[in-house]
């Protein structure tokens, strides 16, 4: 299911003295099966884009086409429930959305809200806890007795239980330690790789962009200023700096090594790419 923005603008509090632009004249396509990262400094419009992906916000002008559903400023909210099942949203600190007495009930709540029987919803809960790497015995526990990282996994399992076609992630690893962050990003990558899950990731972590995304949207001052692969986006460090963005840590390390005589072509963006180019130079004495 593609999501297409066609000259989309959104103004907060339109028609009032407090009106402010959220996004301006954005056009682009998030392809079915892609892993798209949306980056940009704070206030660039990332969150506004995100909220258009399942019509939490509707364009002030332009259209957002989600699958076969065209969203305009005039779209009636009553017709959006099926759409919101297709696009699952995982917000920052998703664990704050938990509220049920048990993990099983919390995960089953979403599917039941969309018409799935209690029996089938609980079966989905059983399946989803395994998918997010939690043991079966958490199902009967209170979500509030779990660790913060486990609570976040439960919240994500609740979104996945609705079996969305598109999974939208807003800084999903915020507040996690490096190990927890890596485990969670690997979980999303597995969903993408093994099930063809379309993923949209809003992040400040350039390492995650390099490691996982196949497409990148760069936002600045409400405008979509650049799209491309991670390699295309990270090819110009000066341009990144001008737009208050940086290189992945691996690329920064490669620059430091290049200053000491090592050669890299193309610029490595991930740890595996760096190792592939660095090991032969260390072993074979190919430094300049």
Swiss-Prot record:
The keyword Cell membrane applies. Transmembrane segments: none annotated. Its main location: membrane. Its EC number is 7.-.-.-. Keywords: ATP-binding, Cell membrane, Membrane, Nucleotide-binding, Translocase, Transport. Forms a stable energy-coupling factor (ECF) transporter complex probably composed of 2 membrane-embedded substrate-binding proteins (S component), 2 ATP-binding proteins (A component) and 2 transmembrane proteins (T component). This complex interacts with a number of substrate-specific components, including FolT and ThiT for 5-formyltetrahydrofolate and thiamine respectively. This is Energy-coupling factor transporter ATP-binding protein EcfA2. It comes from Lacticaseibacillus paracasei (strain ATCC 334 / BCRC 17002 / CCUG 31169 / CIP 107868 / KCTC 3260 / NRRL B-441).
């Amino acid at each position: 299911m593609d999501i297409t923005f066609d000259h989309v603008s959104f103004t907060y509090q339109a028609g009032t003295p407090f009106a402010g632009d959220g996004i301006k004249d954005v056009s682009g396509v998030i392809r079915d099966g892609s892993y798209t990262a949306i980056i940009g400094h704070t206030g660039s419009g990332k969150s506004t884009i995100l909220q258009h992906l399942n019509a939490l916000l509707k364009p002030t002008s332009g259209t957002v086409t989600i699958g076969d559903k065209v969203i305009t400023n005039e779209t009636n909210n009553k017709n959006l429930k099926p759409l919101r099942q297709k696009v699952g949203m995982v917000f920052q600190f998703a664990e704050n959305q938990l509220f049920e007495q048990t993990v099983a009930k919390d995960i089953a709540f979403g599917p039941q809200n969309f018409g799935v029987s209690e029996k089938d919803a609980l079966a989905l809960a059983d399946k989803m806890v395994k998918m997010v790497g939690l043991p079966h015995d958490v199902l009967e526990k209170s979500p509030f007795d779990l660790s913060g990282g486990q609570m976040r996994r439960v919240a994500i399992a609740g979104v996945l239980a609705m079996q969305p076609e598109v999974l939208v992630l807003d800084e999903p690893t915020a507040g996690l330690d490096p190990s927890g962050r890596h485990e969670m990003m690997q979980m999303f990558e597995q969903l993408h790789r093994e099930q063809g899950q379309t993923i949209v990731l809003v992040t400040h972590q350039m390492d995650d962009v390099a490691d996982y995304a196949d497409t990148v949207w760069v936002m600045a001052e409400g405008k979509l200023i650049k799209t491309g692969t991670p390699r295309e986006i990270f090819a110009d460090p000066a341009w990144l700096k001008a737009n208050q963005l940086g290189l992945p840590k691996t690329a920064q390390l490669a620059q430091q090594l290049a200053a000491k005589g090592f050669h890299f072509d193309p610029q490595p963006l991930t740890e595996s790419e760096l190792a592939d180019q660095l090991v032969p130079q260390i072993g074979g004495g190919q430094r300049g």
